[in-house]
Every structure is written in C-alpha cells, then in structure tokens.
Amino acid sequence: MKAKIGIDAGHGGSSLGTYSVNTAQDGLFEKDFTLELALIIEEKLIENGFEVVMSRRSDINPGTVFERAKKMAENEVDFALSVHFNGFEKEGANGSEVFVPYGEKIGEVEERFYGVLEKYFRIREPFARSSNFFDRNAIFDKKLNRKTKRFEAFSDEKDYFGFIRNCWEKGISADLIEICFLTNPSDFSVYVKNKNEIAKGIAKSIVEAFGEKYKEKKPKEKTPRKKLPFEKDAFHVLE
C-alpha cells in the first residue's frame, strides 16, 4: 500500500496570513494561496495512488498548529507538509525556504523540494550565520529541536514551526515550506504563472521520495462535436 500523506494548507478563516502585492485589488491573502496550492498537490498525489489527509479544504481555520498536527497523527500519516507563503513590509525580500525537523537525518524529499523551487525562486538559507534579520538560525534551532519546549515568546497561532515539532513528537516526519514572498512583485508574478508546475513538482518530490514513479495524468481527448444541420464547414463557399 502506498504512503498516506498529510497536507496542511496554512492559515484559513480568520487567520489571513500575509498579504500579496495584489491584495488591494483581488482581496486575496496567504490563506487563499495556501489552500489553492494544497488542493492541487492533493489532486496530483491522489492521481498517483496516494491517500491524502488535508487539514482543510475550504476557507476555515482548522485550529492551532498543535491541533493540525494532532489530526495528522490521528490519521497516521507517513509524512506531513505544511504549505505557507512568506511576506515582509519591504518588497525586496524574496525567495523560498524549506524547514525540516531538527533531528531529521534523511533529507531526500527536502532536496527534491529545493530542486523544484530553485527553478523559479532564490533559495534562502535558514542556517546562514550572520546578524541579518532574515537569518532565522536562533529561532530555527530552538523551535525545531524536539527536546525543547515551546518557545513562549510565540503564541499558538504564530508558532508555525510548532506543526513540524508536534508532528515529530508524534512520530511523523514533517516539513514546512515557504513557497515565495507574496509581497515581492517578481516572486508573486512567477508563482502565479507557474503554480501548477510548482504543485506538480512538490507532489512529484513526495511520490519519488517514497520510491514510486510519478505518473502524469493524461488529459482526456475531446470528442469532436457533431455539426448541426445548419452549420457549414469553414471552407464552404456560399452560392
């Protein structure tokens, strides 16, 4: 039997997440983009024979990161992925990130994720050693260490790494993926144009990491419509 995969569409309902460069026009927030991408990933995984457990399939807030992880554990998933997008007040911030459990030793699926994302975005380094604001090393080390209690400076709703840690503590390997910065015009444009390929790449990464061959569903061929009696061929010459 093929693996059971958990997909968490970040945020939802009253938890909006970050805004995008186009929020003022389309009214969409991170919660909308995570759900859209998660549903496409789910579809691709199901097409390849995998069972999928979703944290949500509509615009609802399914609970804290702890409750989301609990659902994955109750459904005994083999791997869980939390889908997010980044944002920052200065539009220059850009790139993708993949966060993994502190104790994870095998990074096969993560390396595949990076291979997909680097085709479209700059890969950000969470372990970079500097005082730069974007280097999350201190938080990353503390929050993803399964032996460390929850960092109390963060509330349940903002402790996004808590999904990874709580899955890990329940025996589930889980990743958190930040696709790109919705607040960066270039990232946003690239994502919108390539979201289906990105979703496919993520699904393919999971399928292949579990030792299966990814199968692309062939589009159904359209049956030519029979012409009605009064319709003429394009080359018909009227007399």
Question: Can you say where each PLM-predicted feature lies in the sequence?
Answer:
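Active-site-proximal helix/loop segments of hydrolytic enzymes
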Residues: 2-3, 28, 32-239
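Short glycine-rich His-centered loop
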Residues: 2-27
